[in-house]
C-alpha cells in the first residue's frame, strides 16, 4: 500500500480570476483504476468552478468547509463536511463563499471520465510523480 500527501501531487490551474487548482489522484490513466476518477479541487476565497457538465459520469462532491452548490440553476447552501451530487448530463458549479479560506473539494466520478482540456498534461505529470514515489 502507498500513502501520498495530497498536497504533493502535481496540479493544473483551471478557470480564471481567481483560478482553482486541480489534482488528479485516481484515474485509469494514472493508477489503472477503471471504475472511477478522483480529483481534488482547491477553490480560493470567492472562487467558482464555473458551470460545467460531465456527459458520461456522475459526480459526488465533498465540501470540506461548506459553500454553495448550483445544479441546473438551482442553488443549495452546503454545510461543512457535506456531500453534493451531480448526475451525469447536469450543469453544475461549486462556489467558495468565504473571504479568507480555501475550499477543498474531493470529487468522485463514476464511471471514470475521459481526459479533456488540461487533463492529458496533468496525467503525464501525475504519472511521473507516482513513478518517483514508487522508486523510493
Task: Please place each PLM-identified region on the residue numbering.
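A short, N-terminal "cap"/entry segment at the start of jelly-roll beta-barrel domains
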Residues: 1-35, 121-136
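Active-site region of the double-stranded beta-helix
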Residues: 19-58
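Short, charged/polar surface micro-motifs in flexible loops or helix N-caps
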Residues: 30-34, 43-47, 66-68, 90, ...
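Ligand-binding loop in jelly-roll beta-barrel domains
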Residues: 32, 88-118
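Hydrophobic/aromatic beta-strand elements that line small-molecule binding cavities or substrate pockets
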Residues: 39-41, 82, 92
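A short beta-strand-loop-beta hairpin characteristic of the jelly-roll/cupin
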Residues: 48, 54-80, 90-93
Amino acid at each position: 500500500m502507498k500513502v501520498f500527501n495530497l498536497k504533493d501531487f502535481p496540479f493544473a490551474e483551471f478557470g480564471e480570476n481567481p483560478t482553482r487548482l486541480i489534482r488528479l489522484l485516481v484515474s485509469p490513466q494514472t493508477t489503472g483504476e477503471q471504475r472511477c476518477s478522483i480529483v481534488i479541487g482547491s477553490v480560493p476565497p470567492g472562487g467558482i468552478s464555473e458551470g460545467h457538465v460531465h456527459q458520461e459520469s456522475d459526480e459526488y462532491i465533498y465540501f470540506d468547509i461548506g459553500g454553495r452548490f448550483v445544479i441546473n440553476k438551482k442553488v443549495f447552501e452546503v454545510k461543512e463536511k457535506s456531500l453534493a451530487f451531480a448526475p451525469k448530463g447536469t450543469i453544475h458549479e461549486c462556489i467558495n463563499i468565504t473571504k479568507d479560506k480555501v475550499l477543498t473539494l474531493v470529487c468522485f466520478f463514476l464511471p471514470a471520465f475521459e481526459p479533456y482540456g488540461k487533463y492529458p498534461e496533468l496525467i503525464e505529470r501525475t504519472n511521473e510523480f507516482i513513478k518517483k514515489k514508487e522508486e523510493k
